[in-house]
Amino acid sequence: MKITFLAPHIRIAGGARAILTYADRLARRGHDVTVVVPAKRPWRAFWRNVRRRGPDWIPGFRARVRWVAGWDPARLPKADALIATAWRSVDAVARAPANAGTKFYFVQHYESLYHGDPAKVDSTYALPLKKIVISSWLQDIMRERFGSAAEVLVTPVDRDLFHPVEGARSDDALRVLMLHHDYPWKGVREGLEAMAAVKVRHPEVLLVGFGVKRPREALPYEEFHENLPQERLAWLYSRCPIYLCPSWDEGLGMPPMEAMACGAALVTFDNGGCRDYALDGETALVAPRRDVAALAQALERVVTDRLLRDRLAERGRDFVTSRFDWDRAAERFEGVLS
């Protein structure tokens, strides 16, 4: 098949990682795959095409990257499948000619919540594009709010990258790891409040933050790791026995899954997307959305109960590494497109 993805960028951040991994794996399965990416200026698109700039974080990337000044429906390549990957790319897909391929919408979050005008974003979900979503929560939203069917393909963890790293826990310190992000809906404020409540009774527990950038203000992280390369993330996840996810809403949530694959016990809000892997009392402890007191209580349980912590970590690791697999996911993606 000839397959075209419209990707917002090729950085490792956010949902682009899944988009480009699928593009690479489909190309490795013998398909002719093009990823069309907008540049801010026409001259940038020109030089990036000349230099064949692609995602250098995927060794030997097999798909073709085509840089453009903007997504022009009339200039999209002829293909069998054309895939929008965010709400801003949907208009180009919807208006593309028939020879651009069967039209799909790869949905990785309910973007109406935080990304763009809600009415405009919602209008994209109502369009008659075949939908692929990354969680059961998103499938429910598509069905209940828009009367639209969707195929669920949970994004797997890369087991070659994310696994327990021997020697990472070089001391007996009990570390809680949390992603730091400027988006309010990532729940940093709620996470800090929950951690502060636990530290009143357990001051020995250490809060470890990580993120693309350091926080602008002084926050109570005992450690902070800035913009770690992906090969070092497994070490950080493995170093911290507990992963705290205070996000209000997630399309899926890859960092919690990566931490689980590295042997961390997960404590999380019920953020929607986590329901495919965070099974309360089995693979994680789950608190009601934005209920800081409940999140603190769950965190304290994992801090004080070593047997519970180890059981959640073991079951969580087994679940995310056996239930979701990249080879199977690429095969299913291929089947949906065909």
Regions found by a protein language model. Give the residues of each.
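Conserved acidic donor-binding segment of nucleotide-sugar-dependent glycosyltransferases
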Residues: N227, D280-G281, L285-V292, R301-L307
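Short hydrophobic beta-strand element within catalytic cores of glycosyltransferases
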Residues: A265-T268
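A short, well-ordered alpha-helix in the C-terminal region of glycosyltransferases
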Residues: A294, R301, L308-S322, R332-G335
